[in-house]
Amino acid sequence: MKISICGKGGCGKSSITTLLAKEFAKKGHNVLVIDGDESNLSLHKLLGMDLPKDFIEYLGGRKEFMKKLREKMDGKEVELFEGEISIDSLPKEYLVEKDNIKLLAIGKIHDFGEGCACPMGALLREFLKSLKLKDKEVVIVDTEAGIEHFGRGVEGGCDVIIAIIDPTYESIRLSKKIEEIGEKLGKKVYFIVNKVDDETKDLILENVNKDKVIAVIPNNKEIMKCGLMGEELNAELSEIKDVVEILTK
């Protein structure tokens, strides 16, 4: 199963990605977490890992990868990856692993003027389409904020889309767009309502498709502290356990 975690900036995508990854691993799954956000500097910290090397460098860097991709789109026989890709076949020097969870970072913006993130989005799209999973393997993609990754076709390689909704008008509006696009793609779309109290929970549930909501997560001091300090997140939430049960039915 390949899961895309999406939503507006600051809604809690990285925290939910971390909590889901750890719960899937506890249930005996082999988990690959993909950091698909070129601006994200906290996901690896929440997982308690070092930041891996940029995977796009394995393919020659941004310019070389885009050159190969353009040649492929022009009809030339170009292999972006050598043979079939599986989690076990990924180059270990581009992975960090802990407690049955592997972390892969597609690529980051490191310097002024180095160019846009389009090559990283294209690589993530092609990688997800090419990655073949075995039984009990799960991929969780922490996407960049917003919906540009939908325009790049990233979710075409995923089975499930989970939109994280926080107590903001923007987040509610975005969830409706994600639901619309995801259903046109024929993907399963779910919502996780995050960072709420009783009042904001009710307001959100009145304004989204409640049938898509698989968890409502209240404000949590441990999650907030880990996110603020860049510390490993080990919170155990019954809501996350329920999400994993739903996804593995």
UniProtKB/Swiss-Prot annotation:
GO cellular component terms, semicolon-separated: cytoplasmic side of plasma membrane; cytosol
- Determine if Nucleotide-binding is one of this entry's keywords: yes
Q: Mind telling me which residue stretches traverse the membrane in this protein?
A: none
| Organism encoding this protein | Methanocaldococcus jannaschii (strain ATCC 43067 / DSM 2661 / JAL-1 / JCM 10045 / NBRC 100440)
**Single GO molecular-function term?**
ATP binding
Q: Which UniProt keywords apply?
A: ATP-binding, Nucleotide-binding
**Residues annotated to bind ATP:** G7, K8, G9, G10, C11, G12, K13, S14
Protein name in UniProt: Uncharacterized ATP-binding protein MJ0084
Pfam families according to UniProt: CbiA (PF01656)
Q: List the disulfide bonds.
A: none
Q: Does the keyword Chaperone apply?
A: no
